[in-house]
Amino acid sequence: MAKRKTLPKDFEQLVQTASDEDIKKVLGKCDINAYGGYNKGNALEFPLSEEMMRWLIEQGIDINYVDQYGYTPLLYHAGRMLSEKQAIALVKLGADITATQGLDRETVMHVAVKTGNLELVKCLIQAGADAEVTSRSGETPLERAFHWARTFDLIKLAPVAEYLIGIGVPVTDKIRTYMRSAAEDIEFRRKDMSPDIMPELDRAMESLYGLLGVASVPRRVEYDGTSPIVIHEKRWQKQHGELWNLLVPGSGHAGTVQGEVIRISGKLAYEILDNACCNWDSDFKSMANALYRYICMGTPLDAYEQREFAGLINGIKDADETDINRLTEL
């Protein structure tokens, strides 16, 4: 009788509740490389015990089977905090530690560092993995991790960075720049973050500041709603950034009309210039109309500039960088 090419639909639930012997009985009815799950990987991509993995390898399963998204079992588990023990088991059982995935050809080491799997990183080093291997874009695992690090990622990244730097991985200017960017984003949104996680996040940030030689990002000073709004910068681009930091909250609407003018102009610029209007909908058009109403309030632009601004708003979706810069300047 021919064996099935796919794993049972409930295989993931099965491996979490059934014994290894029961799992073997189920797998005995399947081809050794039968695939399943969202990624259509073979059985090694599921949360099996090390003993079960060893048995499958002895039966001839492909330890480096590539699923429909380009992941080997090791790459798949390396990218999940809860799968670290499976990833370590696969390294010990001989999985290819040089396998890559994605358009940027990230290695297992890249994935493990980015995920914050410290014990897996140590295991990979012991197995001979290169801690300074570069992706297609030329980034080392530590550079790649800081490139994508946001808010709480720094908590899990701090001990990994300490370990890698401790064994000689260099701290590059890229890493410092990425760390600075992540820290600035955290300080901008600090008020909106859960206070329960902040002590741990602050400890991680202080550790990384010292470890990487990055100056601490100062706490954000927000507008109190009543004081005069004072601008210190001279160029309009710098003025917009200064007002953004002062008036725009980490999330939601600003508390003042001035803040809404800065917030909306910034959101429109990002959607048009950075996203090429891929998310454009009636909400963005409404924001553009609201921006024009706000501009006409208080101390409005002179008549000529109001007409110019109205023209820019009417053609906002088709605006180019020059148009957006002029709108933001006004």
Please give the residue ranges for each predicted region.
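Ankyrin repeat domain, specifically the short helix-to-loop turn at the C-terminus of the second helix
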Residues: 24-31, 54-63, 88-97, 122-130, ...
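Internal alpha-helical scaffold/solenoid segments in large eukaryotic proteins
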Residues: 105-139
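Eukaryotic tandem repeat interaction scaffolds
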Residues: 84-90, 96-102, 106-110, 114-116
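Coil-to-helix interface segments in alpha-helical RNA-associated scaffolds
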Residues: 49, 82-86, 119, 152-157
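Ankyrin repeat (ANK) tandem arrays and their immediately adjacent linkers/low-complexity segments
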Residues: 102-107, 133-330
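Ankyrin-repeat intra-repeat helix-capping/turn positions
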Residues: 18, 48-51, 81-82, 116, ...
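Ankyrin-repeat boundary/"N-cap" motif
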Residues: 4-12, 34-46, 66-79, 100-108, ...
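N-terminal segments that cap or nucleate solenoid repeat domains
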Residues: 2-46, 51-56, 61
